UniProtKB/Swiss-Prot annotation:
It comes from Psychrobacter cryohalolentis (strain ATCC BAA-1226 / DSM 17306 / VKM B-2378 / K5). Belongs to the malic enzymes family. PROSITE patterns: MALIC_ENZYMES. One of its GO terms (molecular function) is malate dehydrogenase (decarboxylating) (NAD+) activity. Divalent metal cations. Prefers magnesium or manganese. Keywords: Metal-binding, NAD, Oxidoreductase. Its cofactor is Mg(2+); Mn(2+). This is NAD-dependent malic enzyme. It is an enzyme of class 1 (oxidoreductase). The active site is at residues 100, 171. SMART domains: malic, Malic_M. The keyword Repressor does not apply. Its EC number is 1.1.1.38.
């Protein structure tokens, strides 16, 4: 736990109350009120953080819509970050869907309408020659984790322009709530490169740069200016790319992953949590991942990232790469990806099926999802299409004909874009399918039996990766580190008692889970020579030292 010794600060009076990282509100002691010129600025009664949190929760429950609850929670975050995270800690299962998916999607769409206070940095293309100055202007100086987006592919909602800032803000809140990384170390950044969303361009309330998106060399040069400025300002930072369009996501990751410690959560984080969930689901039915035939609906960067991670895991279980690739089938709107197709994305090419391997298939119909499920005898189905309702009853019944307990993972966010609801899958499979989703869903029921729906959410993985990187002081994130995170999640899932239908442990244990994943990631970083060797005892000590808890510290006054 980060030390709880007194903190010496130069702020006083209203300036202190307006500093979210330091504000304690009604919890300032009598001595602090005198020392920091706060006497008379606060109600007389001195409260504990528990009392403040109880009031905040009472106020939260008074709102009826999730959007209003999100706005209220963001207001607390922007006025008192310690209280914000204490409230999350006390009610994490209820609050997480409000600060992140699914509610954050609506918040991104309405960002300019609900904007209250500044948070993070907005780096616009017209001001690209001032990036160094902008990074110096950040209110947080000792930044260790950055989440950056350009707002082009927000969840399943597409181009949201600067509204995409809601995602880095939400992600970093989870780095703290789940992974114990101090909010003082976290910085959300929005790269404002314009928007192609005409609705936003026509909206008089839109606060971003009103211009079509830049692309090509202009875009790449701008991102490079940003990356080089970050390297100068915080050379040891962990930078997470978030919600970039697939034509930019993979090239940016490949270009910069050896230049600074960075990863793309949509590609690598989604892959790690998906594979961890899949391994755990296979353990639920006493099988290995390498025994499965797997189909993906959606062959974008996220789906292909998961597929490549699955192939690596199959190889760890004893298959050759060629054998593993024959068991993974990618389906997009044009059907099954095969080596006869042209104009495929570079990251899709290694995942095509050879026409020679499927020459015995019945091709009298288009090789769409239903045909692939039937002819490839699919046992695991991933949904990463961002399109509602594409998992049909025919598809699920075909899965059930291939295996007694098919694994169905409709991962698209938000809930309005899910390929099938868990209740639909449960009904069509007559309670046989093992289901996990990308966003939270209520329990399903079938013939009087209730089944819990696990949320295959990146929040199970990326906070632990971040904590592990910081604890090990890693200089990069390898594929092996991501695989270690997946395996750790699966192993942890076996340890916890779970409700019927559940694959992953309850989210209320997320901090314990993140610590264990962080330890596995840090060990792998050392093994991969991306971090200096350290004893297990010292590594555990570092993890504890980096784990921030939402508690108020005593303040002592000092001068600038």
């Amino acid at each position: 736990m980060l030390n709880q010794r007194p903190l010496y600060i130069p702020f006083a009076g209203p300036a202190l109350l307006e500093t979210p990282l330091l504000n304690k509100g009604s919890a300032f002691s009598s001595e602090e009120r005198d020392s920091f010129n706060l006497t008379g600025l606060l109600p007389h009664n001195i409260e504990t953080i528990e009392e403040q949190s109880s009031r905040a929760y009472l106020q939260l429950r008074s709102f009826t819509s999730d959007m209003d609850k999100h706005i209220y929670l963001r207001n607390i975050q922007d006025t008192n970050e310690t209280l914000f995270h204490h409230l999350i800690e006390q009610h994490i299962e209820e609050v997480m869907p409000l600060i992140y998916t699914p509610t954050v999607g609506q918040a991104c769409e309405k960002f300019s309408q609900i904007y209250r206070r500044k948070r993070g940095l907005f780096i616009s293309y017209p001001e690209r020659h001032k990036i160094d100055d902008m990074l110096q202007n950040a209110t947080k100086q000792n930044v260790k984790v950055i989440v950056v987006t350009d707002g082009e592919r927000i969840l399943g909602l597409g181009d949201q322009g600067i509204g995409g800032m809601g995602i880095p803000i939400g992600k970093l809140a989870l780095y703290t709530a789940c992974g114990g990384i101090s909010p003082a170390y976290c910085l959300p950044i929005l790269l404002d490169v314009g928007t192609n969303n005409q609705q936003l361009l026509d909206d008089p309330m839109y606060m971003g740069w009103r211009n079509p998106r830049i692309s090509g060399d202009e875009y790449n040069e701008f991102v490079d200016l940003f990356i080089q400025a970050v390297k100068r300002r915080w050379p040891e930072v962990l930078l997470q790319f978030e919600d970039f369009a697939q034509e930019n996501a993979t090239p940016l990751l490949n270009k910069y992953r050896d230049q600074l410690c960075c990863f793309n959560d949509d590609i690598q984080g989604t892959a790690a949590v998906s594979v961890g969930t899949l391994i755990a689901a296979c353990l639920n039915k006493s099988q290995k991942l390498s025994q499965q035939n797997i189909a993906f609906l959606g062959a974008g960067s996220a789906g292909c990232g998961i597929a490549e991670h699955i192939i690596r895991q199959m190889q760890r279980e004893g298959l050759t790469e060629e054998q593993a690739r024959r068991q993974v089938f990618m389906v997009d709107r044009y059907g099954l990806l095969t080596d006869s197709m042209t104009e495929l994305q570079k990251f899709q090419t290694p995942l095509v099926q050879k026409e020679s391997d499927i020459e015995h298939w019945d091709k009298s119909q288009k090789l769409g999802l239903a045909q692939v499920v039937k002819q490839a005898r699919i046992t695991v189905l991933f949904g990463v299409s961002g399109q509602k309702g594409l998992f049909t009853q025919e598809v699920v019944e075909a899965l059930c004909a291939n295996t007694e307990h098919p694994i169905v993972l409709p991962l698209s966010n938000p809930t309005s874009r899910v390929e099938a609801t868990p209740q639909e899958v449960t009904n069509w499979s007559r309670g046989k399918a093992i289901v996990a989703t990308g966003s939270p869903f209520p329990n399903t029921t079938f013939e009087g039996q209730s089944y819990e729906v696990s949320q295959c959410n990146n929040s199970y993985i990326f906070p632990g990766i971040g904590l592990g990187v910081l604890a090990a002081r890693a200089t990069g994130i390898s594929d092996n580190m991501l695989t270690a995170a997946s395996q750790a999640l699966a192993d942890i899932s076996v340890e916890y008692e779970k409700a019927p239908g559940a694959i992953l442990p309850p989210i209320k244990f997320i901090r314990e889970i993140s610590e264990k994943i962080a330890y596995a990631v840090a060990l792998q970083a050392i093994e991969d020579k991306l971090a200096l060797p350290v004893t297990a005892e010292n590594l555990e000590r570092r993890l504890k030292a980096n784990f921030w808890l939402p508690k108020y510290r005593d303040y002592r006054r000092t001068s600038f």
